[in-house]
């Protein structure tokens, strides 16, 4: 079977996992046969992913953005929007992961965050000023569970699919380290931090359109306190995706915030 040839800049071709060869004096990228999956996540994902054409991707992206705008409670549409618009940002995140020793370990291990993989009984025994204890307290105070995240289905590259999965499963951990609740104000503020930190379009959309739904009193607090704080932390903080949160349970949460360049908003 003939391989499809693509005339792409060499760095972009290599970034997308293509082979680069010289043809008539020009660098040409050729699609290689799909490599054998290297781990359980990739094997499972390749069984369950839904393959879509470029046209379907555009159609799904447009449709899900309209549906999410009309009804922000449609988490399925928000998830679809993230997958159909986030590939370029995910490629940049992948570069960031590969440039960090901690990020490389995450990509090698591909840890998952739900009740079947995290020892929450152990976290409950940790001192209250540790990250693990703060995470458990966040889950209880906000009555949320790590098992509620939707599975990724529409991304072609399993590595990018894992990064989107990782982003979703770490969302509550970002809430924890930012000390933000899951109410509308907290969600919009966290989305701004995530948008500036990851570059994911869906985060920008959630931040902008989520703010529209704030009530007048909330909007005043948002503009005066939450938005300036979120923008400052989003721009100043270190990349959060390469943080191996599961290795930080015992770390003092104040030291962790200092390491990541995060400050907590004084809500008084």
UniProtKB/Swiss-Prot annotation:
Residues annotated for Zn(2+) binding in this entry: 171-172, 175, 187
GO annotations of cellular component type: extrinsic component of mitochondrial inner membrane
Subcellular location per the Swiss-Prot or TrEMBL entry: Mitochondrion inner membrane
GO BP field: ubiquinone biosynthetic process
Main localisation: mitochondrion
Pfam families assigned to the protein according to its UniProt record, in alphabetical order: Coq4
Catalytic activity: a 4-hydroxy-3-methoxy-5-(all-trans-polyprenyl)benzoate + H(+) = a 2-methoxy-6-(all-trans-polyprenyl)phenol + CO2
EC number(s) given by UniProt: 4.1.1.130
Chain's role: Lyase that catalyzes the C1-decarboxylation of 4-hydroxy-3-methoxy-5-(all-trans-polyprenyl)benzoic acid into 2-methoxy-6-(all-trans-polyprenyl)phenol during ubiquinone biosynthesis.
Subunit structure as annotated in this protein's UniProt entry: Component of a multi-subunit COQ enzyme complex.
Similarity section: Belongs to the COQ4 family.
Protein name (database record): Ubiquinone biosynthesis protein COQ4 homolog, mitochondrial
């Amino acid at each position: 079977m003939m391989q499809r040839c693509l005339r792409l800049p060499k760095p972009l071709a290599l970034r997308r996992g293509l082979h680069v060869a010289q043809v008539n004096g020009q660098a040409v990228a050729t699609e290689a046969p799909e490599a054998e999956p290297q781990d359980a996540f990739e094997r499972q994902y390749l069984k369950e992913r839904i393959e879509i054409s470029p046209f379907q991707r555009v159609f799904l992206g447009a449709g899900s953005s309209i549906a999410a705008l009309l009804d922000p409670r449609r988490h399925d549409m928000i998830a679809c929007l993230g997958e159909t618009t986030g590939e370029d940002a995910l490629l940049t995140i992948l570069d960031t992961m590969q440039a960090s020793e901690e990020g490389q370990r995450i990509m090698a291990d591909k840890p998952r965050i739900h009740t079947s993989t995290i020892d929450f009984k152990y976290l409950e025994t940790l001192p209250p000023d540790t990250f693990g204890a703060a995470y458990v307290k966040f889950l209880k105070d906000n009555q949320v569970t790590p098992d509620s995240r939707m599975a990724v289905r529409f991304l072609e590259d399993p590595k990018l699919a894992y990064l989107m999965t990782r982003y979703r499963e770490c969302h509550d951990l970002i809430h924890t380290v930012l000390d933000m609740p899951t109410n509308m104000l907290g969600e919009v503020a966290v989305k701004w931090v995530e948008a500036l930190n990851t570059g994911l379009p869906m985060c920008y959309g959630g931040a902008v359109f989520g703010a529209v739904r704030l009530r007048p009193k909330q909007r005043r607090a948002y503009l005066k306190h939450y938005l300036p704080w979120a923008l400052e932390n989003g721009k100043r903080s270190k990349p959060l995706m390469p943080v191996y949160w599961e290795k930080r349970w015992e770390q003092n949460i104040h030291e962790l915030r200092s390491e990541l360049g995060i400050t907590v908003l004084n809500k008084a």
